[in-house]
Amino acid sequence: MNKINQLRNFLNKQNCDAYLIPKNDEYFGEYVPKNKDRLKFISGFTGSTGLALILKNKSYLFVDGRYTLQAKKEIYKDFKICEIPKIKPHYILKNLNKEITLGFDPKLFTSNTLKNIISNSLVKIKPINNNLIDAVWKNKTKINNNKFYILEEKYHGENYLNKISKINKFLKLKDIHYLLTTAVENISWLLNIRGSDASSSPLTNGKILFNKNGKIIYLQILIKLHLKLKNLLERK
């Protein structure tokens, strides 16, 4: 049984009629680790941006004009190429002229992206926390516990405590109770850390949540939080 048919079997179990697969992972960075390149796994396409829409009887790959020729050479025969903006996902969904349930991994999409995809269609969206591509991808390589390091002051120029203090003042000024930061480049800058999660950029993946007093109440950097950084943050 090929990958698409396996995915459709999982869709049936979830009572879904379709499924979305983006290029990005949950950190929305420019570079996607090989073991999170779900679009390549399901379609064969290796370009830097794209979106797959899997229906019960058809499969679509949406790419912009830069990638149409590349996609023709790479994609599996199950897929039809749709060049954006000539054909957008909501065109396909709208022209189905029927109600369908569209499954997606909520970690991989913003609300605005979803609104654009389902606009003017009869689509009901259904978040599925366990990614269905991962369920099909049995031989996926394990996520590496990539190391990261703290920059010396001569390189970053400003202590992370000073930066957090500025955030604290801003939150109080605007009467904001919490600030969630998920952009990996912002976190790397804020905490003066660098890493190797991206193949072509010294970034470390993570998410950070501040309260209105500027205190870090949640820090997620995979499972890599080493003792030195942990001690520094706990002093705050």
Where are the regions a protein language model picked out?
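Ligand-binding face of N-terminal immunoglobulin V-set domains in extracellular IgSF glycoproteins
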Residues: 102
